């Protein structure tokens, strides 16, 4: 008899098959003496579409809303039906007596496998493989410690509840908005609050009125002292007359050192990366989108097998990982990391390390290197950058704390308080892992008293006429969101909550904010693809479509409190603390209330981006929209779906102003255009680049267009596709 193993993806299945000795190729499977390994392609089974329950739902009609099937059912996804058949063929084999679920260890991974098994009416006993990396060692250890799949029944119930709740609320609300306002409008419990946060930030920027402030400094003996309010501790003076008086007084008297305080301090390295923190860093340092970072991490995890599971929300390790740290250090002991790894090995590797805490790891531990030796030459430049971030953070936490001496000088000029600060490094410790010293998670730019190198000074010293400076500044508006800062806001949206009740704040903290670490990148990407967001440089802006949508969506759907409440209840279901049927009854009642509110709402939606160009398919006027990397014309009719690309942003630099150029046209007619007015046909561009030693071939251009083709092929006007985008959270 044999055991059937179901993996989530072909690449993971191949790794498991190799470890288990399954080399014989079957239809959609790999077979060995004891095991058969097959795979899904992500989800092979999904919830049925509305029209699958009743033909009347095929037409988008407000009169039939809300759609509330008595029991939501599942169906095979047509595009992946062939692989579903391959899996069920193996399931039905008489020589298969046991199933091992080896999909991703988490709520959605559980759903991938369980829906396949449910649809196939499987009755065979199941075990669960729960691992955080796909190295040979992790797979072997995982199979040596298989769990009974029944231990994860509550996790499955939570996953189904999430999917069904999003179906009921998302599809019904999307159809209601689309029907009422005759425009492709979608909403969801995560994407809509995310838009609302961006809208609030834009409102804060619009309403911001800069206010002048003044600072007074005294330069003496090579040190700059800053005036400080003894009561508030602030260094900014709002009253210009007061600032002028302080400056004039300081010019007439000597500076006296009142106190010189020196303290030796130490600081541990920043915690290990979870996915969100890694996406933030990659956005800030390299300008990578959240989705790009996730894709690179996925490649380093699945293809190269040099980093652990990427979709984690923990920055800690469990005690059982500690014995593997030495092997992981051996694996990274190459090139630029060799000396640091050797130094880290001399530190005590035990469970007392500050980043080891079982209680702070739920499904997966922090992202760290695997025991697999890496070949840096096999990584792309982008992959190597992400790998470098993870390895340096891993090495940093294993190195000693950084030790420094902090000096704070308090001085006075005729009863006015002045202060200066300095820091002298004693032992670099973990900072040696960072060549560029960009290691600190805190924004040191906010320090009002800058740190400086201080000479040897003692209390009581009197310094004659210091050089006094009075400077005027203006307060700055809040910064616009980038993908990195938007991820931070989604992870911790408390600032954007109307209700700051302590229980709600605690709930959203425990639930992990808006969305999950595994879905936030996709949510942001979908907001761009739905033309609700656009980018200018690295900054994110709302489109007119998004601003109008937020006026039409029920207020409840715009609040982070809603998704926090859902996630907390889903976690309770996963832990067996709440019954699934109770949660779903509440969701059905909420859906009815939501649709009633949309039906009775007064409002209008106006396309303010209509062009005079008509759709070649249906004759309606096209809409001009800005995609993430392109400008497009799309049909306003949601059933038509026509779109065409007008221009694309490229990495090609203008020879005049050195800014990025756009590409318009196709093939030999393609032309590069710059905002400064420079234009260049493709042939001329290729000739120029060849002379400069950076020739661009047709293959280069084709590869670039292929890379960006995905956005151009996204079905933005298929109404049900839009609905699905709004609810896959």
Predicted feature descriptions by range:
Residues 2-4, 80, 91, 174, ...:
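Basic, low-complexity terminal or inter-domain segments flanking catalytic cores
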Residues 237-271:
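Metal- or metallocofactor-binding catalytic centers and their adjacent structured scaffolds
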Residues 1-163, 230-231, 477:
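Intrinsically disordered, low-complexity regulatory segments
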Residues 27-55, 192-238, 397-450, 589:
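Structured, non-catalytic alpha/beta "coupling" segments that mediate domain-domain communication
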């Amino acid at each position: 008899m044999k055991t059937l193993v179901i993996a989530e993806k072909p690449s993971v299945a191949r790794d498991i098959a190799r470890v288990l000795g399954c080399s014989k190729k079957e239809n959609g499977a790999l077979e060995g003496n004891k095991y058969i390994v097959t795979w899904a392609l992500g989800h092979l089974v999904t919830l049925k579409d509305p029209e699958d329950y009743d033909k009347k739902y095929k037409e988008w009609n407000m009169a039939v809303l809300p759609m509330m099937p008595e029991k939501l059912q599942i169906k095979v996804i047509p595009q992946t039906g062939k692989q579903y058949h391959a899996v069920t063929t193996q399931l039905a084999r008489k020589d298969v007596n046991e199933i091992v679920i080896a999909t991703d260890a988490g709520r959605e991974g559980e759903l991938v496998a369980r829906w396949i098994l449910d649809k196939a009416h499987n009755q065979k006993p199941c075990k669960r493989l729960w691992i955080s990396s796909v190295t040979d060692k992790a797979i072997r250890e995982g199979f040596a410690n298989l769990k009974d799949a029944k231990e994860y029944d509550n996790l499955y119930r939570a996953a189904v509840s999430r999917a069904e709740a999003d179906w009921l609320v998302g599809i019904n609300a999307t159809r209601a908005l689309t029907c009422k306002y005759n425009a492709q409008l979608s909403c969801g419990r995560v994407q809509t609050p995310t838009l609302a946060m961006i809208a609030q930030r834009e409102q804060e920027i619009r309403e911001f009125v800069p206010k002048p402030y003044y600072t007074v400094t005294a330069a003496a003996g090579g040190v700059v002292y800053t005036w400080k309010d003894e009561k508030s501790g602030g260094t900014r003076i709002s009253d210009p007359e007061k600032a002028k008086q302080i400056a004039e007084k300081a010019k007439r008297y000597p500076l006296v050192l009142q106190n010189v305080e020196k303290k030796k301090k130490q600081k541990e390295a920043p915690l290990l990366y979870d996915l969100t923190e890694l996406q933030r860093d990659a956005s800030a340092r390299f300008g990578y989108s959240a989705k790009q970072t996730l894709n690179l991490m996925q490649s380093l995890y699945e293809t190269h097998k040099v980093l652990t599971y990427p979709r984690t929300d923990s920055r800690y390790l469990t005690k059982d990982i500690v014995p593997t740290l030495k092997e992981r250090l051996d694996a990274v002991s190459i090139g630029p990391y060799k000396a640091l790894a050797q130094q880290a090995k001399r530190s005590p590797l035990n469970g007392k390390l500050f980043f080891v805490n079982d209680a702070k790891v739920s499904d997966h531990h922090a992202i760290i290197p695997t025991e697999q030796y890496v070949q840096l030459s096999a990584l792309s430049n982008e992959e190597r950058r992400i790998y470098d971030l993870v390895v340096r953070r891993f090495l940093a936490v294993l190195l000693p704390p950084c030790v420094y001496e902090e000096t704070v000088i308090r001085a006075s000029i005729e009863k006015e308080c002045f202060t200066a600060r300095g820091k002298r490094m004693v032992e670099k410790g973990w900072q040696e892992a960072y060549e560029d010293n960009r290691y600190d998670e805190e924004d040191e730019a906010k320090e009002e008293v800058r740190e400086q190198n201080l000479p040897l000074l003692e209390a009581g010293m009197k310094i004659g006429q210091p050089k006094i400076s009075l400077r005027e500044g203006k307060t700055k508006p809040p910064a616009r969101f980038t993908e990195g800062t938007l991820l931070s806001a989604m992870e911790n949206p408390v600032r954007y909550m109307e209700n700051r009740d302590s229980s709600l704040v605690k709930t959203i903290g425990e639930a992990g904010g808006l969305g999950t670490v595994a879905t936030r990148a996709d949510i942001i990407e979908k907001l761009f693809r739905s033309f609700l967001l656009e980018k200018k440089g690295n900054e994110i802006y709302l489109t007119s479509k998004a601003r109008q949508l937020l006026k039409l969506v029920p207020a409840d759907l715009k609040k982070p409190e809603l998704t926090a409440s859902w996630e907390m209840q889903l976690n309770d279901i996963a832990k067996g603390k709440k019954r699934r049927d109770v949660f779903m009854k509440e969701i059905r009642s909420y859906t009815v209330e939501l649709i009633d509110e949309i039906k009775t709402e007064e409002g209008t939606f106006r396309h303010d981006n209509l062009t005079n160009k008509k759709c070649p398919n249906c004759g309606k006027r096209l809409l001009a929209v800005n995609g993430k990397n392109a400008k497009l014309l799309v049909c306003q009719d949601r059933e038509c779906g026509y779109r065409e690309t007008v221009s694309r942003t490229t990495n090609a630099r203008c020879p005049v102003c050195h800014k990025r150029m756009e590409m318009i046209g196709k093939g030999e007619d393609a032309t590069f255009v710059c905002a400064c007015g420079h234009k260049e046909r493709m042939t001329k561009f290729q000739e120029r680049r060849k002379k400069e030693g950076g020739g661009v071939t047709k293959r280069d251009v084709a590869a670039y267009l292929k890379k960006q083709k995905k956005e151009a092929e996204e079905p933005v006007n298929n109404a049900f596709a839009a609905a699905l985008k709004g609810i896959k959270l």
